Amino acid sequence: SAAEVLVDEKNKVYGVATGDMGVSRDGSAKDSWESGMELHAKYTLFSEGARGSLSKYLIDNFDLSEGKDYQKYAIGIKELWEVKEENHQEGLVEHSMGWPLSDGTGGGSFLYHFGQNQVSVGYVVHLNYSNPYVSPFDEFQQFKTHPSVKSVLAGGKRISYGARAITAGDYQSVPKL
């Protein structure tokens, strides 16, 4: 993966460099050591997630957040379920805010009905909560006990799941592109 942004003397991005391979924990070179390589490109697309190290460098180096609001972050948890046919409504999209979160903790949910009796259910919790005991995973589990969600998932089977940090700021917090 990329470890460094390549910038020329005119402050123009011309690619990325990968990290060295075969480096031991103490930083010394192993027998398998190989130098990282430079990948030069006319266009370089950065897509490393909510707060990647290369993105932070680009935002700082090119002052891309000037005049922008601070970015907000959240944790998003998602599960893919195969549900009973009678609980499925292909194309249905549902969103909610709040419950079961307490006052002062932002977040919400989604429930998307895909084809083949598949439903994606997810919960997002903003990471600016003041209660240090808030557990986004536990909030998600409680959310699935809500009658409208529980009835969709009843008798179904979770087939995959995942979680990741996401940006949750509004348009005013998106860096210049």
Summary of predicted features, one role per range:
Residues 2-154:
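Predominantly flavin-linked oxidoreductase catalytic cores and closely associated redox partners
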Residues 151-163:
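A short coil-to-beta-strand element that immediately follows conserved catalytic motifs
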Residues 164-177:
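FAD-binding beta-loop-beta segment adjacent to the flavin cofactor pocket
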